[in-house]
Amino acid sequence: MADNQEERPHFPLDEGSIIEGVSDQVIVVVLLSFVAVGSLIYLLLRNDEQNIHPENQDRVRAVREQLQNEQETPAPPRPQFYSDMTCPVCLQQATFPVETNCGHLFCGSCIIAYWRYGTWLGAINCPICRQTVTLLFPLFGATDQEDAQNILQEATGYNRRFSGQPRSLMDRIMDLPTLLRHAFREMFSVGGLFWMFRIRIVLCLLGALLYLVSPLDIIPEALFGILGFLDDLFVLFLLLIYISIMYREVVTQRLYR
């Protein structure tokens, strides 16, 4: 009777897998996903050390001395906008802080004085990382204080002159963390981005999600295994760059309203 029984198909498990019953390729894909997401979160929330680049130390020192000489009376206690946030130019707590497109923060008056020091012909390089500064993001709201209004006007004038400069692919990648952080912050804030831009971001994210879950891939995972997952990450990366480009265009258009 046993001889008449049909032989049941036997599917052997991966004997050399790290976790029994789970393919090593699945484990690698999951780990890479966590690494990619963790790296993106780190880039969006990072707070780099505010160390002046050696090539800019002389210029920063001159600007610091100039600001100290112009200050006739002792400065009042400055409000602390961030934990342990010190402007690397004046070495004090940042007041009316301004963030560059490379993600470094300065006092609004300090970065404007740094720009004015010397020639005004072109965009400045960040005193910390030497990246070209094409956008200044004021991190304070409009107030009745004259100093705040002057800084907002100076930052707006700077952005009008340099925000539309051509950007290389490497520059766009380096600007990605800061632009995405500001874009998503405004997306979920009242009175932030206009609705058409929010809809475009949502549609882009939905398109990326559909591509990730779709069985139709440029490099199918069924044939190429772990290599087939790389095209999904590449599409997601291109999507983030596209969102940052759209947000830069929105910021530039605001300057001419």
Curated annotation (Swiss-Prot):
InterPro entries: DUF1232, RNF170, Znf-RING_euk, Znf_RING, Znf_RING/FYVE/PHD, Znf_RING_CS. It comes from Xenopus laevis. It catalyses: S-ubiquitinyl-[E2 ubiquitin-conjugating enzyme]-L-cysteine + [acceptor protein]-L-lysine = [E2 ubiquitin-conjugating enzyme]-L-cysteine + N(6)-ubiquitinyl-[acceptor protein]-L-lysine. Keywords: Endoplasmic reticulum, Membrane, Metal-binding, Transferase, Transmembrane, Transmembrane helix, Ubl conjugation pathway, Zinc, Zinc-finger. A zinc finger (RING-type) spans 87-130. It is a multi-pass membrane protein. SMART domains: RING (SM00184). The gene is rnf170. It is found in: Endoplasmic reticulum membrane. One of its GO terms (cellular component) is endoplasmic reticulum membrane. The chain crosses the membrane at residues 25-45, 201-221, 223-243. This is E3 ubiquitin-protein ligase RNF170. E3 ubiquitin-protein ligase that plays an essential role in stimulus-induced inositol 1,4,5-trisphosphate receptor (ITPR) ubiquitination and degradation via the endoplasmic reticulum-associated degradation (ERAD) pathway. Also involved in ITPR turnover in resting cells. One of its GO terms (biological process) is protein ubiquitination. Its main location: endoplasmic reticulum. SUPFAM superfamilies: RING/U-box (SSF57850). PANTHER family: E3 UBIQUITIN-PROTEIN LIGASE RNF170, RING-TYPE DOMAIN-CONTAINING PROTEIN. The keyword Zinc-finger applies. Pathway: Protein modification; protein ubiquitination. It holds the Pfam family zf-RING_UBOX. The keyword Endoplasmic reticulum applies. Residues 46-200, 244-257 are cytoplasmic. Its EC number is 2.3.2.27. One of its GO terms (molecular function) is ubiquitin protein ligase activity. Residues 1-24, 222 are lumenal.
